[in-house]
């Protein structure tokens, strides 16, 4: 006889699997067919009749038998209902198959709303995309003493073409980073790619018997569930009293529409139960990418499986020269990069969209205005991937980037990132700016794949004495939002830096020195002046 504890676990697993058949397979909400305007309304499928085809033996017997009348009962059409299709609520059906939905039906969820699904003492796995790192990393999730937490880093194929970097080198880098930056000790930081199937075995090995996946919308939780189901299929009894076959549990609903999941969804994967939670938003109640971008552009951004490896291998760049007029670079109007005058820059873009340069931001916004005003698509419509409200400068935030040497990556939360590099002999000529829609967080980082690779090699060569992350300089930083009228951006940045670090004086490096002496000439190691990120 099985121990009582194992019987209880099996009983709970059966209950969790049963939930999948009374809930919407896309969003997880409980289905009902009484109130058409209520949450979870669906139309029950009609029973379909399928005629069984006669087998070849029956046909032969019919052709060559002398007693045809005796075959009537044997050859009568046998009718049987078809297997039930996955059930889906009207809200998800309209959005997925008819592309009709309202923002109110796909609202954001606060962290408190998501946590109501998680019992105390549960095993939580914080899913954070490497493309957005560290913007979606939430220290409150990892350090919550009520739960056992670990870090899973998704979408690794969009930062490196080398899966061995995720398997062998990334764990040590993130282990040292969490300890150094957040004072958090963990040996369970796994980087993976669900769409490519990279490192899925390692993810499964760190999952506990009953695990909860938590993260922001479209962080890759549901895609991970499907990758796990594919590699570790779980069998369950078929529906019906006479069913004897087994079928694989249906996968998680994956969509390019943000906030598709709105209730807990549990999956029996191998010998473990994985619970997929709705995505939470730290800026709950504030505008997000869906309030600024066109639906088609947002769809391309969310379809991460379409990302091509050749982008990372070839790294094709666009040259951008800064001018006194404020020449800018954009990708479908999602953001506007304004370099300092007389600088030559290379931009390697990893965000889906069409690249274009304008004389200045005012000219770019006038194109947005004219294209939305035109009833028919104009010649520049392909470069406008934002909603009509984004024709106004008031709907943008001016982010000033701290000084940098060499290459950096500019990260836009829930959108993606691009690489920026100044070329030629180094000379400080001013600060770069990135204008983005309100509600979109921005940060910069040294190229993360290079950080992981160089950090791991340094860790190995020192036999573990040297950490896999630089200790003497900051490699991640928030940006500095400023008013449109601010002209002395370097001085304003210093003031904002001092305010941000008033409770972290150890982060105040080079404060007593003249900033122009520090960033005026190239340094052997980038000083990264005014770089600071609040973990």
From Swiss-Prot:
Ranges for domain CP-type G: 111-283
Record: transit peptide: 1-38
Pfam family, one: MMR_HSR1
GO CC terms of this entry: mitochondrion
Keywords for the protein's UniProt record, in alphabetical order: Mitochondrion, Transit peptide
Single GO molecular function: GTP binding
InterPro entries: G_CP_dom, GTP-bd, Mito_lipid_metab_GTPase, P-loop_NTPase
Protein localization: Mitochondrion
Family classification: Belongs to the TRAFAC class YlqF/YawG GTPase family. GEP3 subfamily.
PANTHER family hit by this protein: GENETIC INTERACTOR OF PROHIBITINS 3, MITOCHONDRIAL
Function: May be involved in the mitochondrial lipid metabolism.
The protein, known as: Genetic interactor of prohibitins 3, mitochondrial
Taxon lineage: Eukaryota, Fungi, Dikarya, Ascomycota, Saccharomycotina
Gene: GEP3
């Amino acid at each position: 006889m099985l121990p009582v504890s194992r019987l209880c676990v099996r009983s709970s697993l059966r209950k969790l699997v049963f939930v999948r058949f009374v809930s919407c397979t896309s969003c997880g909400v409980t289905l009902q067919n009484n109130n058409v305007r209520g949450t979870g309304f669906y139309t029950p499928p009609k029973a379909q009749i399928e005629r069984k085809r006669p087998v070849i033996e029956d046909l032969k017997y019919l052709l060559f038998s002398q007693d045809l009348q005796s075959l009537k009962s044997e050859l009568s059409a046998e009718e049987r209902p078809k297997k039930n299709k996955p059930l889906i609520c009207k809200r998800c059906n309209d959005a997925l198959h008819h592309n009709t939905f309202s923002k109110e039906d796909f609202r954001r969820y606060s962290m408190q709303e998501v946590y109501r699904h998680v019992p105390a003492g549960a095993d939580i796995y914080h899913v954070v995309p490497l493309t957005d790192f560290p913007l979606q990393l939430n220290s409150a999730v990892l350090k919550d003493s009520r739960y056992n937490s670990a870090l899973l880093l998704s979408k690794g194929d969009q930062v490196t073409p080398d899966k061995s970097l995720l398997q062998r080198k990334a764990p040590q880098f993130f282990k040292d980073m969490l300890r150094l930056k957040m004072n958090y000790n963990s040996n369970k930081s796994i980087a993976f790619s669900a769409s490519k199937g990279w490192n899925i075995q390692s993810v499964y090995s760190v999952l506990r018997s009953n695990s909860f996946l938590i993260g922001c919308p479209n962080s890759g939780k549901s895609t991970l569930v499907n990758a796990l189901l594919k590699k570790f299929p779980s069998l369950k009894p078929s529906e019906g009293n006479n069913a004897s076959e087994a079928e694989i549990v249906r996968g998680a609903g994956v969509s390019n529409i943000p906030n598709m999941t709105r209730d807990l969804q549990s999956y029996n994967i191998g010998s473990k139960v994985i619970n997929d939670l709705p995505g939470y938003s730290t800026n709950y109640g504030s505008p997000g990418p869906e309030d600024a971008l066109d639906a088609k552009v947002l769809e391309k951004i969310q379809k991460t499986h379409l990302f091509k490896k050749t982008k990372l291998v070839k790294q094709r760049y666009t040259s951008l020269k800064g001018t006194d007029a404020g020449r800018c670079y954009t990708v479908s109007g999602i953001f506007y990069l304004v370099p300092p005058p007389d600088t030559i820059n290379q931009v390697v873009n990893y965000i889906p969209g069409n690249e274009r340069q304008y004389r200045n931001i005012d000219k770019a916004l006038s194109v947005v205005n004219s294209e939305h005003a035109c009833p028919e698509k104009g010649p520049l419509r392909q470069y406008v991937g934002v909603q009509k409200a984004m024709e106004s400068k008031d709907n943008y935030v001016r982010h000033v980037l701290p000084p940098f040497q060499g290459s950096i990556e500019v990260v836009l939360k829930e959108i993606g990132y691009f690489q920026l590099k100044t070329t030629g002999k180094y000379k400080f000529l001013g600060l770069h700016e990135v204008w983005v829609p309100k509600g979109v967080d921005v940060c910069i980082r040294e190229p993360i794949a290079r950080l992981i690779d160089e950090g791991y090699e340094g860790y190995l060569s020192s036999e573990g004495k040297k950490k896999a992350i630089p200790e003497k300089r900051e490699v991640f930083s928030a940006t500095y939002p400023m008013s449109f009228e601010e002209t002395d951006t370097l001085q304003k940045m210093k003031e904002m830096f001092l305010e941000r670090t008033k409770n972290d004086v150890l982060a105040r490096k080079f404060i007593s020195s003249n900033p122009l002496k520090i960033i005026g000439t190239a340094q052997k190691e980038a000083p990264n002046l005014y770089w600071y990120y609040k973990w």
